[in-house]
């Protein structure tokens, strides 16, 4: 049957949401917009109970899906609203990211929106539940989530959303709401870049790209990398200058495979995330999109490392030209909030051939030595180059001893040496990676 009776207060959610100005840029298919429309239809009596109940269940299911993705617990409605607030990129929130709120007329509009969100936080669903004969909103207001392994969700996002949600529950009015939300923007930022440490890029047609968060980045820190203290210190000094707004250089980490080059960069991102450092991993075939990537991040209040792993070029590859163009810059000044950190097994990045060494002119009238110089000059565009060389056998054993100690492996040094030596002979030779794989093997045996 069609509901003809007007239920006082039910349309209130629609009225609240319709007042949003700065945060009103939500898609019509978003959960909040759909719920507000459901309650409007209910108040107008334009749909049957069965239709309204089905629509309500659909949106509650979507809230549960968001909660599952981020391992939300307790009040899922509050968690969802908080998630909206800290992922909504608008002129106000972006201005506040990493610097906080400033005096200005926009604060009046923001507080008006936060008053609406405060009303949504306190929204009473009981009348709707009574009329439709459901209890789903009561259930998600005190939800007991099933425990999930960390690899199945983004723990960083989960913890931040739930912590802010619990704070917002205590806000007395829109002024306290304003302070709490803008404090969050100052501490972490807003949207995808505020909540995540690292990203990859994806092509999405028409020469456009979008960023995809890396949800479960390795939690490694620099102290986990045994040895290489000089190398780590050089990387730290350059990165600290960068995040503090001082002059810093692009960095090339080169050397033997398995020596900790990639691990060092991941560790740097983990250690300086709270200071606004973010990483965007880009592959060689995506270098054509570099200018597009830079255009999308240059005006954000973060420090971005564009990370290129295992960087090298064969003689016939020309992608290095895109990289050189970005590093050198053109008419436009290179943004100060972007650096390139790359790893490579090659010191000069581009394979040099005997033809390159010849000074015979090619068909284009250029000396081959000029071509070689153009290729090899790429490495000079990195202001800091750090050599990660293969450890000596003594250093290899020291790495094994330290990793064994951290792992709680009870084995004498002589036996460790003997077994570690056997392992490296059949597993690719001496390196930090080989040492870690050996320790993983021992840990598996102990289990």
Q: What does each model-identified segment do?
A:
Residues 1-166:
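Intrinsically disordered, low-complexity N-terminal extensions of AAA+/P-loop NTPases
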Residues 145-211:
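Interdomain "pre-motor" coupling segment immediately N-terminal to P-loop NTPase/helicase cores
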Residues 246-265:
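Walker A/P-loop nucleotide-binding motif
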Residues 271-304, 311-316:
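AAA+/P-loop NTPase substrate/partner-engagement loops
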Residues 385, 389-447:
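C-terminal alpha-helical "lid" subdomain
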């Amino acid at each position: 049957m069609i509901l003809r009776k007007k239920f006082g207060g039910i349309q209130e959610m629609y009225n609240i949401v319709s007042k949003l100005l700065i945060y009103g840029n939500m898609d019509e298919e978003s959960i909040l917009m759909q719920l507000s429309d459901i309650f409007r239809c209910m108040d107008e009596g334009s749909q049957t109970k069965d239709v309204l109940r089905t629509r309500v269940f659909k949106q509650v299911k979507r809230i549960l899906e968001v909660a599952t993705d981020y391992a939300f617990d307790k009040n899922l409605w509050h968690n969802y609203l908080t998630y909206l607030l800290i992922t909504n990129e608008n002129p106000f929130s972006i201005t506040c990211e990493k610097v906080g709120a400033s005096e200005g007329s926009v604060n009046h509009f923001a507080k008006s929106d936060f008053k609406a969100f405060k009303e949504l936080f306190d929204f009473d669903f009981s009348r709707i539940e009574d009329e439709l004969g459901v209890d789903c909103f009561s259930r998600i207001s005190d939800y007991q989530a099933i425990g999930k392994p960390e690899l199945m969700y983004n723990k960083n996002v989960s913890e931040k959303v739930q912590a802010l949600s619990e704070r917002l529950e205590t806000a007395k009015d829109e002024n306290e709401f304003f302070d709490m939300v803008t404090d969050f923007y100052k501490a972490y930022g807003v949207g995808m870049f505020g909540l995540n440490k690292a990203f990859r890029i994806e092509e999405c047609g028409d020469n456009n790209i979008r960023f995809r968060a890396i949800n479960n980045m390795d939690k490694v820190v620099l102290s986990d990398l045994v040895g290489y203290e000089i190398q780590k210190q050089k990387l730290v000094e350059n990165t600290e200058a960068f995040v503090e707004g001082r002059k810093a250089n692009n960095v090339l980490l080169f050397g033997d495979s398995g020596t900790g080059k990639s691990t060092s960069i991941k560790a740097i991102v983990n250690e300086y995330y709270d200071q606004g450092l973010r990483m965007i991993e880009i592959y060689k075939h995506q270098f054509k999109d570099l200018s597009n990537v830079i255009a999308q991040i240059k005006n954000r209040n973060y420090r971005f490392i564009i990370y290129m792993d295992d960087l090298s070029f064969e003689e016939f590859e020309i992608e290095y030209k895109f990289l050189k163009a970005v590093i050198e810059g053109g008419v436009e000044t290179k943004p100060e909030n972007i650096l390139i950190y790359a790893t490579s097994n090659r010191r000069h990045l581009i394979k040099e051939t005997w033809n390159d060494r010849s000074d015979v002119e090619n068909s284009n009238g250029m000396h081959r030595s000029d071509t070689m110089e153009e290729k090899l000059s790429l490495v000079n565009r990195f202001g800091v180059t750090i050599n990660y060389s293969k450890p000596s056998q003594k250093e290899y054993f020291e790495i094994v001893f330290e990793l064994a100690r951290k792992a709680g492996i009870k084995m004498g040094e002589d036996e460790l040496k003997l077994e570690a030596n056997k392992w490296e002979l059949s597993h690719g030779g001496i390196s930090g990676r080989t040492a870690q794989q050996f320790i993983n093997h021992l840990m598996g045996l102990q289990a």
